[in-house]
């Protein structure tokens, strides 16, 4: 798991997300508390439960982006789910328990990757020996078994040197490689994905792992053999246990669009995709044991971060029990013109940098002036104010409209330089921004 301090986490998030300091601080503290808890003695560690977070703010202000970036920083099992995908147990649709199953699958994949990386050096040695055995077959004894010699022959050593220097990369060899598992496509109704996964695993295990001769270049064979040998060095049962421990101690679940499962007004009949889902989430957030194909997983110490726009509902519309299990509330602010201007220039791989790089592939140099960027930010803010406020996502729409002519003609404009200043932006956007009907349907 990550050992970054809260200040380091916020600094890293600042590289991608503009503003929203309160939300960044909250997730940074929550992430650091995961590390702090692991430093306690076992008895006290069991008593310290995570303080779950509810992020509240209009659409397009950075809630989901914080989750995306946090997933990369956490170095822990992480999953992002949409609350609207689930229904109450017993109805058609995904059950909330599948969140923990998917989180465990992600953890197994993560732990397997880490284990393979640790074994890579040994796997490279074994892969090298297998390729050399094909190039220079070892001498065999009277029983047809390879003879065990104390020292490799000079010829083998010479080929080993060439192999390491890449001189044999393009040479084709025929070698036995693990055959791809038999694919069994099973169509299942919504909510039955777990059953189909188990059936597919069963059919693959019946087929077994077979070796199949393939004619392939040494460079490609080396990569495949490394993966194959590394997989042999990993203990599957130990790997599963490590993954379950990682989920139970460090797992993070981000539930997006939680406001969409709030009950609005008085409705008759069962509310299976709203209040029913909230009731099903309660035991997960409070702590329960979920059965997965890898084993039983306890959710007592999994951190839950929920987010929602709450534009047509409020956090108080959540059932009281769920409100109590999300004790930390963070409100994200709507974005201003200054924020839009910073979003266009400051983040790593900002939108303007992306468009410049895309046009550079056609040999077209695009430059954005400071006044031009300010004008784009003002246009996006005005459209947000006069129509639906979709936050920073409006910048994508405005920029795409602004760059439409340049993108269309770029293939025939090799070597040209284009400067996007306030006048250029005004020429292409002023009419659309001024006309409310046009901006509503086009921007």
From Swiss-Prot:
GO terms assigned for molecular function: ATP binding; ATP hydrolysis activity; peptidase activity; proteasome-activating activity
Single biological process term from Gene Ontology: proteolysis involved in protein catabolic process
Source species of the chain: Yersinia enterocolitica serotype O:8 / biotype 1B (strain NCTC 13174 / 8081)
NCBIfam families assigned: hslU, PRK05201.1
Quaternary data: A double ring-shaped homohexamer of HslV is capped on each side by a ring-shaped HslU homohexamer. The assembly of the HslU/HslV complex is dependent on binding of ATP.
Major localization listed first in the record, in broad terms: cytoplasm
Stored SMART domains: AAA, ClpB_D2-small
UniProt entry keywords in alphabetical sequence: ATP-binding, Chaperone, Cytoplasm, Nucleotide-binding, Stress response
Location in or out of the cell: Cytoplasm
Residues the record lists as binding ATP: 18, 60-65, 256, 321, 393
Function: ATPase subunit of a proteasome-like degradation complex; this subunit has chaperone activity. The binding of ATP and its subsequent hydrolysis by HslU are essential for unfolding of protein substrates subsequently hydrolyzed by HslV. HslU recognizes the N-terminal part of its protein substrates and unfolds these before they are guided to HslV for hydrolysis.
Name of the molecule in the record: ATP-dependent protease ATPase subunit HslU
Superkingdom, taxonomy of origin: Bacteria
Protein family per UniProt: Belongs to the ClpX chaperone family. HslU subfamily.
High-level lineage: Bacteria, Pseudomonadati, Pseudomonadota, Gammaproteobacteria, Enterobacterales
Cellular component, GO annotation: HslUV protease complex
């Amino acid at each position: 798991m990550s050992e970054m301090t809260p200040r380091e986490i916020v600094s890293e998030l600042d590289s991608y997300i503009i503003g929203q300091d309160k939300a960044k601080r909250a997730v940074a503290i929550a992430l650091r508390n995961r590390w702090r808890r692991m430093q306690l003695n076992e008895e006290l560690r069991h008593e310290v439960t995570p303080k779950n977070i509810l992020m509240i703010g209009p659409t397009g202000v950075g809630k989901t982006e914080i989750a995306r970036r946090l997933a990369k920083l956490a170095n822990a099992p992480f999953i992002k789910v949409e609350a609207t995908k689930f229904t109450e147990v017993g109805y058609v649709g995904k059950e909330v328990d599948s969140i923990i199953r998917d989180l465990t699958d992600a953890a197994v994949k993560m732990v397997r990757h880490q284990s393979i990386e640790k074994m890579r050096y040994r796997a490279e040695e074994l892969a090298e020996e297998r390729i050399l055995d094909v190039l220079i077959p070892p001498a065999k004894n009277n029983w047809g078994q390879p003879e065990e010699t104390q020292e490799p022959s000079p010829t083998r050593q010479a080929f080993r040197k060439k192999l390491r220097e890449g001189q044999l990369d393009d040479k084709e060899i025929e070698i036995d490689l693990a055959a791809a598992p038999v694919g069994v496509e099973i169509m299942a109704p919504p909510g039955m994905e777990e059953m189909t996964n188990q059936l597919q695993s069963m059919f693959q295990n019946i087929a077994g792992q077979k070796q199949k001769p393939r004619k392939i270049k040494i460079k490609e064979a080396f990569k495949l053999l490394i993966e194959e040998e590394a997989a042999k060095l990993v203990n599957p049962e130990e790997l599963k246990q490590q993954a379950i421990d990682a989920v139970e101690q460090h797992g993070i679940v981000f539930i997006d669009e939680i406001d969409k499962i709030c009950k609005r007004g008085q409705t008759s009949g069962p509310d299976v995709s709203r209040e029913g889902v909230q009731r099903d989430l309660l035991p997960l957030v409070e702590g329960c044991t979920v059965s997965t194909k890898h084993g039983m997983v306890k959710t007592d110490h999994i951190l839950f971060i929920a987010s929602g726009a709450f534009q047509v509902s409020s956090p108080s519309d959540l059932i009281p029990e769920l409100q109590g299990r999300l004790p930390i509330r963070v409100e994200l602010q709507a974005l201003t013109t200054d924020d839009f201007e910073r979003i266009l220039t400051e983040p790593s791989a900002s939108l303007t940098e992306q468009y410049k790089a895309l046009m550079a592939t056609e040999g077209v140099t695009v430059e954005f002036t400071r006044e031009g960027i300010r004008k784009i930010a003002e246009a996006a803010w005005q459209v947000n104010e006069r129509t639906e406020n979709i936050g920073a996502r409006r910048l994508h729409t405005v920029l795409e409209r602004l760059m439409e002519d340049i993108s269309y003609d770029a293939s025939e404009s090799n070597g040209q330089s284009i400067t996007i200043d306030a006048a250029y932006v005004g020429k292409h956007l002023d009419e659309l921004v001024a006309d409310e009907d046009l901006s509503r349907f086009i921007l």
